[in-house]
């Protein structure tokens, strides 16, 4: 018998809306984290409902990113625009049919298969207040890293070419070009893939 699809919400942490990846990580983990960006300590007491919090790294990520403050301060440092997108946030409910003892293995398997294996860092926390709404928060990095653990650009400039393979010059003297994402993680199709996989 199929399990009904539980709550699954995806949002982007945006600096333009006054949001912070460090604050998001502090909220879900219950840790006290200092934000180098705004020089403020972020703390939201979630100890009563926190079951487990963990950071899962791809093999090429710097080991230091297993520290929550180091990771999210590094993310905020590389995103230097006022309107930067800092992280992807997913909040998902555990199906009521799943025993509590399976929550950790279930969320780790989901994060590994859907995110970490693709190069994202996944910072997750399982919350359970005992009110019948056990759920997990996942913060994901938006930038890929090279094999040395250096953040890569989110997009690159690509010059448009004519039928002869030559760059097209505009009347302004500039070359016609467009931006291409360096990873396809923002493609809308993944929202459905992730929901279906959960």
Report the location of each language-model feature.
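N-terminal nicking endonuclease/strand-transfer module with a His-rich metal-binding environment
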Residues: 1-197
């Amino acid at each position: 018998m199929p399990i009904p699809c539980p709550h699954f919400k995806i949002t982007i942490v945006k600096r333009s809306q006054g949001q912070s990846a460090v604050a998001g990580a502090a909220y879900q983990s219950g840790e006290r984290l200092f934000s180098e960006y705004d020089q403020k300590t972020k703390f939201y007491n979630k100890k009563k409902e926190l079951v487990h919090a963990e950071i899962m790294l791809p093999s090429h990520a710097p080991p230091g990113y297993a520290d929550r403050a180091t990771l999210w301060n590094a993310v905020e440092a590389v995103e230097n625009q006022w309107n930067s997108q800092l992280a992807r946030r997913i909040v998902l409910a555990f199906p009521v049919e799943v025993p509590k003892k399976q929550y950790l293995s279930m969320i780790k398997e989901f994060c590994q298969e859907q995110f970490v294996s693709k190069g994202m860092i996944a910072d997750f926390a399982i919350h359970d207040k005992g009110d019948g709404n056990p759920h997990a928060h996942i913060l994901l990095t938006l930038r890929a890293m090279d094999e040395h653990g250096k953040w890569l650009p989110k997009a690159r400039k690509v010059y448009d070419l004519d039928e002869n393979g030559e760059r097209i010059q505009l009347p302004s003297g500039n070359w016609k070009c467009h931006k291409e994402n360096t990873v396809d993680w923002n493609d809308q199709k993944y929202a459905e893939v992730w929901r279906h996989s959960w």
